[in-house]
Amino acid sequence: MGWNEAIKLRSASLPALCLLYVTCALDASGAASYAKEAVITETAGTVRIAADSPRPLEQVLNALQSKYGWIVNYEDPQYVSAVDVIKASSDSQVPSGGSFTFEFSSAAPDEGKTLRQLVDTYNKSKNPGHFELRHTADGGFNVVGTAGHSDKGEIVEQQAPFDLALTLSNKEQTIDETVTRICAEVSRQSRSNVVLAISPRKILFQNRVALGGNKVAARELLSKSLGATHGKIYWRLLFDPESKNYYLNLHLVHGV
Protein backbone atom coordinates (compact mmCIF):
# COMPACT_ATOMS: atom_id res chain seq x y z
CA MET A 1 0.00 0.00 0.00
CA GLY A 2 1.38 3.40 -1.00
CA TRP A 3 1.18 6.62 1.01
CA ASN A 4 -1.65 8.04 -1.13
CA GLU A 5 -3.60 4.81 -0.73
CA ALA A 6 -3.04 5.01 3.03
CA ILE A 7 -4.56 8.50 3.11
CA LYS A 8 -7.58 7.23 1.18
CA LEU A 9 -7.95 4.26 3.54
CA ARG A 10 -7.69 6.59 6.52
CA SER A 11 -10.54 8.69 5.16
CA ALA A 12 -12.62 5.70 4.08
CA SER A 13 -12.15 4.09 7.50
CA LEU A 14 -13.63 7.02 9.40
CA PRO A 15 -17.23 5.69 9.42
CA ALA A 16 -16.07 2.27 10.63
CA LEU A 17 -13.75 3.96 13.08
CA CYS A 18 -16.58 6.05 14.50
CA LEU A 19 -18.62 2.87 14.93
CA LEU A 20 -15.69 1.27 16.73
CA TYR A 21 -15.46 4.26 19.11
CA VAL A 22 -19.21 4.18 19.76
CA THR A 23 -19.03 0.45 20.49
CA CYS A 24 -16.17 0.98 22.93
CA ALA A 25 -18.05 3.81 24.62
CA LEU A 26 -21.17 1.69 25.02
CA ASP A 27 -19.16 -1.19 26.42
CA ALA A 28 -17.28 1.06 28.83
CA SER A 29 -20.48 2.69 30.05
CA GLY A 30 -21.72 -0.61 31.36
CA ALA A 31 -24.16 -1.56 28.59
CA ALA A 32 -22.25 -4.81 28.26
CA SER A 33 -21.42 -4.93 32.00
CA TYR A 34 -17.88 -3.67 31.44
CA ALA A 35 -16.20 -1.13 33.71
CA LYS A 36 -15.19 2.27 32.38
CA GLU A 37 -11.86 1.96 34.16
CA ALA A 38 -10.07 -0.43 36.49
CA VAL A 39 -10.63 -0.17 40.24
CA ILE A 40 -7.50 0.29 42.36
CA THR A 41 -7.47 -0.61 46.06
CA GLU A 42 -4.62 -0.89 48.54
CA THR A 43 -4.77 -2.87 51.78
CA ALA A 44 -2.20 -4.55 54.03
CA GLY A 45 0.72 -3.67 51.78
CA THR A 46 -0.89 -5.03 48.62
CA VAL A 47 -2.14 -3.10 45.61
CA ARG A 48 -5.09 -4.72 43.87
CA ILE A 49 -6.23 -3.66 40.39
CA ALA A 50 -9.54 -5.11 39.19
CA ALA A 51 -10.24 -4.69 35.48
CA ASP A 52 -13.35 -5.59 33.51
CA SER A 53 -13.01 -4.80 29.83
CA PRO A 54 -12.79 -6.35 26.35
CA ARG A 55 -9.07 -5.52 26.76
CA PRO A 56 -8.42 -5.93 30.50
CA LEU A 57 -4.63 -5.86 30.16
CA GLU A 58 -4.78 -2.43 28.52
CA GLN A 59 -7.15 -1.27 31.27
CA VAL A 60 -4.65 -2.32 33.95
CA LEU A 61 -1.86 -0.47 32.11
CA ASN A 62 -4.03 2.64 32.13
CA ALA A 63 -4.54 2.22 35.88
CA LEU A 64 -0.79 1.86 36.48
CA GLN A 65 -0.20 5.01 34.45
CA SER A 66 -2.75 6.86 36.56
CA LYS A 67 -1.27 5.67 39.87
CA TYR A 68 2.47 5.64 39.16
CA GLY A 69 2.94 7.61 35.94
CA TRP A 70 4.27 4.58 34.08
CA ILE A 71 3.92 5.18 30.34
CA VAL A 72 3.69 1.86 28.50
CA ASN A 73 2.82 1.30 24.84
CA TYR A 74 0.27 -1.44 24.13
CA GLU A 75 -0.36 -3.48 20.97
CA ASP A 76 -3.21 -5.95 20.40
CA PRO A 77 -2.68 -9.30 18.73
CA GLN A 78 -5.21 -10.24 16.05
CA TYR A 79 -8.48 -11.41 17.57
CA VAL A 80 -9.84 -13.67 14.85
CA SER A 81 -11.08 -16.90 16.42
CA ALA A 82 -14.43 -17.63 18.02
CA VAL A 83 -12.58 -18.06 21.32
CA ASP A 84 -11.17 -14.52 21.28
CA VAL A 85 -14.23 -12.62 19.99
CA ILE A 86 -17.76 -12.04 21.31
CA LYS A 87 -20.78 -9.97 20.34
CA ALA A 88 -21.01 -6.67 22.21
CA SER A 89 -24.20 -5.00 23.36
CA SER A 90 -24.21 -2.99 20.13
CA ASP A 91 -24.19 -6.32 18.23
CA SER A 92 -20.67 -5.72 16.92
CA GLN A 93 -17.69 -7.94 17.64
CA VAL A 94 -15.18 -7.10 20.37
CA PRO A 95 -12.35 -9.03 22.05
CA SER A 96 -13.72 -11.54 24.54
CA GLY A 97 -11.98 -10.08 27.57
CA GLY A 98 -13.70 -9.68 30.90
CA SER A 99 -12.70 -9.72 34.55
CA PHE A 100 -9.01 -9.71 35.43
CA THR A 101 -7.38 -8.99 38.78
CA PHE A 102 -3.73 -8.17 39.37
CA GLU A 103 -2.07 -7.86 42.78
CA PHE A 104 1.43 -6.77 43.76
CA SER A 105 3.32 -5.35 46.73
CA SER A 106 2.81 -1.66 47.40
CA ALA A 107 6.33 -1.30 48.83
CA ALA A 108 8.12 0.89 46.23
CA PRO A 109 7.13 -1.25 43.23
CA ASP A 110 9.72 -1.57 40.47
CA GLU A 111 8.21 -0.77 37.07
CA GLY A 112 9.94 -3.49 35.05
CA LYS A 113 9.41 -6.22 37.65
CA THR A 114 5.76 -5.27 38.14
CA LEU A 115 5.04 -5.16 34.41
CA ARG A 116 6.70 -8.56 33.94
CA GLN A 117 4.53 -9.98 36.72
CA LEU A 118 1.46 -8.37 35.14
CA VAL A 119 2.06 -9.86 31.69
CA ASP A 120 2.86 -13.30 33.13
CA THR A 121 -0.30 -13.22 35.25
CA TYR A 122 -2.42 -12.14 32.29
CA ASN A 123 -1.03 -14.87 30.03
CA LYS A 124 -2.12 -17.46 32.60
CA SER A 125 -5.67 -16.10 32.66
CA LYS A 126 -8.52 -17.09 30.35
CA ASN A 127 -8.63 -13.69 28.67
CA PRO A 128 -7.88 -13.34 24.95
CA GLY A 129 -4.46 -12.91 23.45
CA HIS A 130 -0.94 -13.64 24.58
CA PHE A 131 1.58 -10.86 25.24
CA GLU A 132 5.27 -10.13 25.69
CA LEU A 133 6.94 -7.33 27.63
CA ARG A 134 9.57 -5.62 25.48
CA HIS A 135 12.25 -3.23 26.76
CA THR A 136 13.07 -0.17 24.67
CA ALA A 137 16.47 1.42 24.07
CA ASP A 138 15.53 4.47 26.14
CA GLY A 139 14.48 2.40 29.16
CA GLY A 140 10.76 2.27 28.38
CA PHE A 141 8.43 -0.67 27.86
CA ASN A 142 6.09 -2.03 25.21
CA VAL A 143 3.43 -4.67 25.85
CA VAL A 144 3.11 -6.50 22.54
CA GLY A 145 0.48 -9.04 21.49
CA THR A 146 2.27 -12.03 19.98
CA ALA A 147 -0.38 -14.77 19.84
CA GLY A 148 -4.09 -15.50 19.82
CA HIS A 149 -6.25 -18.57 20.28
CA SER A 150 -7.38 -20.97 17.62
CA ASP A 151 -11.03 -22.04 17.51
CA LYS A 152 -9.91 -25.08 19.54
CA GLY A 153 -8.49 -22.85 22.25
CA GLU A 154 -4.84 -23.46 21.39
CA ILE A 155 -2.32 -20.60 21.45
CA VAL A 156 -1.22 -19.70 17.91
CA GLU A 157 1.83 -17.49 17.42
CA GLN A 158 1.40 -14.30 15.36
CA GLN A 159 3.76 -11.72 13.97
CA ALA A 160 3.25 -8.37 15.64
CA PRO A 161 2.73 -5.72 12.92
CA PHE A 162 5.31 -3.36 14.38
CA ASP A 163 7.93 -6.14 14.43
CA LEU A 164 8.06 -5.89 10.64
CA ALA A 165 11.35 -4.58 9.25
CA LEU A 166 10.76 -1.58 7.00
CA THR A 167 12.95 0.10 4.41
CA LEU A 168 12.01 3.74 3.96
CA SER A 169 13.82 6.41 1.96
CA ASN A 170 15.04 9.30 4.08
CA LYS A 171 12.51 12.07 3.68
CA GLU A 172 11.58 15.15 5.67
CA GLN A 173 7.84 15.33 6.33
CA THR A 174 5.42 16.34 9.02
CA ILE A 175 5.24 13.75 11.76
CA ASP A 176 1.65 13.02 10.75
CA GLU A 177 2.84 12.20 7.22
CA THR A 178 5.73 10.13 8.54
CA VAL A 179 3.53 8.04 10.86
CA THR A 180 1.03 7.55 8.03
CA ARG A 181 3.88 6.40 5.77
CA ILE A 182 5.01 3.88 8.41
CA CYS A 183 1.45 2.57 8.76
CA ALA A 184 1.14 2.28 4.97
CA GLU A 185 4.32 0.21 4.71
CA VAL A 186 3.26 -2.06 7.57
CA SER A 187 -0.11 -2.51 5.84
CA ARG A 188 1.63 -3.40 2.59
CA GLN A 189 3.71 -6.12 4.24
CA SER A 190 1.08 -7.57 6.58
CA ARG A 191 -2.36 -9.11 6.32
CA SER A 192 -4.07 -6.23 8.12
CA ASN A 193 -4.36 -2.55 7.34
CA VAL A 194 -2.96 -0.22 9.98
CA VAL A 195 -4.73 3.14 10.15
CA LEU A 196 -3.72 6.20 12.16
CA ALA A 197 -6.80 7.07 14.18
CA ILE A 198 -6.74 9.19 17.35
CA SER A 199 -3.76 11.52 17.62
CA PRO A 200 -2.72 14.99 18.85
CA ARG A 201 -3.06 16.30 15.30
CA LYS A 202 -1.83 19.83 15.96
CA ILE A 203 1.49 18.58 17.30
CA LEU A 204 1.90 16.02 14.52
CA PHE A 205 1.21 18.61 11.82
CA GLN A 206 3.34 21.38 13.31
CA ASN A 207 6.49 19.28 13.80
CA ARG A 208 8.64 17.78 11.08
CA VAL A 209 11.14 14.94 11.05
CA ALA A 210 13.65 13.55 8.54
CA LEU A 211 13.41 9.80 8.88
CA GLY A 212 14.32 6.70 6.92
CA GLY A 213 16.12 3.42 7.34
CA ASN A 214 17.04 0.06 5.88
CA LYS A 215 15.26 -2.92 7.45
CA VAL A 216 14.41 -1.10 10.67
CA ALA A 217 11.58 -2.36 12.88
CA ALA A 218 8.39 -0.34 12.39
CA ARG A 219 8.15 0.13 16.15
CA GLU A 220 11.57 1.79 16.24
CA LEU A 221 10.68 4.10 13.36
CA LEU A 222 7.42 5.03 15.05
CA SER A 223 9.17 5.74 18.34
CA LYS A 224 11.76 7.97 16.64
CA SER A 225 9.03 9.85 14.78
CA LEU A 226 7.07 10.57 17.94
CA GLY A 227 10.25 11.53 19.77
CA ALA A 228 10.68 14.41 17.33
CA THR A 229 7.63 16.11 18.85
CA HIS A 230 9.68 16.78 22.01
CA GLY A 231 6.60 15.72 23.95
CA LYS A 232 5.67 12.42 25.57
CA ILE A 233 3.37 10.42 23.30
CA TYR A 234 2.41 6.79 23.84
CA TRP A 235 0.39 4.48 21.62
CA ARG A 236 -2.39 1.95 21.68
CA LEU A 237 -2.54 -0.31 18.61
CA LEU A 238 -6.03 -1.83 18.68
CA PHE A 239 -7.32 -4.61 16.44
CA ASP A 240 -10.95 -4.39 15.30
CA PRO A 241 -12.45 -7.89 14.82
CA GLU A 242 -15.16 -6.45 12.55
CA SER A 243 -13.03 -4.75 9.90
CA LYS A 244 -9.85 -6.77 10.59
CA ASN A 245 -8.00 -3.43 10.65
CA TYR A 246 -5.57 -2.17 13.24
CA TYR A 247 -6.21 1.35 14.55
CA LEU A 248 -3.24 3.28 15.91
CA ASN A 249 -4.21 5.68 18.69
CA LEU A 250 -1.60 8.19 19.85
CA HIS A 251 -2.02 9.93 23.20
CA LEU A 252 -0.14 12.95 24.52
CA VAL A 253 0.92 12.89 28.16
CA HIS A 254 0.27 16.33 29.62
CA GLY A 255 2.49 17.93 32.22
CA VAL A 256 5.61 15.92 31.30
What are these regions (language model features)?
Residues 1-256:
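N-terminal targeting/assembly segments of extracytoplasmic apparatus and virion spike/baseplate proteins
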